[in-house]
A protein has these predicted regions:
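N-terminal glycine-rich phosphate-binding loop for ADP-containing cofactors
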Residues: 1-186
Length: 186
């Protein structure tokens, strides 16, 4: 009964409720974490934050993963990453270096981007390597499937809707699991 009342309230505030079982990060944060982690690993490998973000904007995401880390806050990303990744997973060097110098993202005026003018100052993105968007979303796709397989989310359609509405995942795809299903048919 409590869940039904909570869902009714969420509808009243014009949001879409999605009942999920309790798990670290539930659905949205559980799938965003691996996606943002992979994006920062790519930055560690030498690609610019602008290039990483451009790849995902071109894919159809509303915002790049590096810009998202800046908005969430590097301190929050660091803490959430530890909680979601588990023991033994090292945080990306680019995150640790910025965090250790007090660059916490938009809230501190500097993170991966400089916000001293109020808006992020970005350099021109480099050439986006072929396959970069696919590499970046692969952990998100995998984690979404794991959550369905574990029964955290009741089924693939609900997971797809939750990830689209909760993260802005490129809506034209029909959601991450639909994207995998239709991509594999080609």
């Amino acid at each position: 009964e409590v869940a039904l009342r909570a869902a009714a309230f969420i509808r009243q505030i014009d949001r879409l409720p999605l009942l999920v079982k309790s798990a670290p990060g539930f659905l949205v944060n559980a799938v965003l974490g691996p996606y943002m982690l992979e994006a920062m690993r790519v930055v560690d490998e030498g690609l610019s934050p602008e290039t990483v973000d451009e790849a995902m904007l071109a894919f159809g995401m509303p915002m790049g993963p590096i810009a998202l880390v800046d908005i969430v806050g590097l301190d929050v990303a660091m803490a959430a990453g530890r909680g979601l990744a588990g023991a033994g997973v090292e945080p990306p060097k680019c995150l640790v270096e910025r965090f250790n110098t007090g660059c916490l993202g938009k809230k501190s005026g500097k993170g991966f981007y400089d916000y001293s003018t109020g808006k992020p100052e970005r350099r021109v993105a480099g050439i986006v390597p072929a396959g970069l968007a696919e590499r970046l979303i692969a952990p998100l796709l995998e984690r979404t499937q794991q959550l369905v397989d574990a029964g955290i989310v009741a089924d693939a359609d609900l997971a797809d809707a939750g990830v689209i509405f909760g993260t802005g995942f490129a809506p034209f795809t029909g959601g991450p699991l639909n994207y995998v299903k239709t991509r594999n048919k080609d």
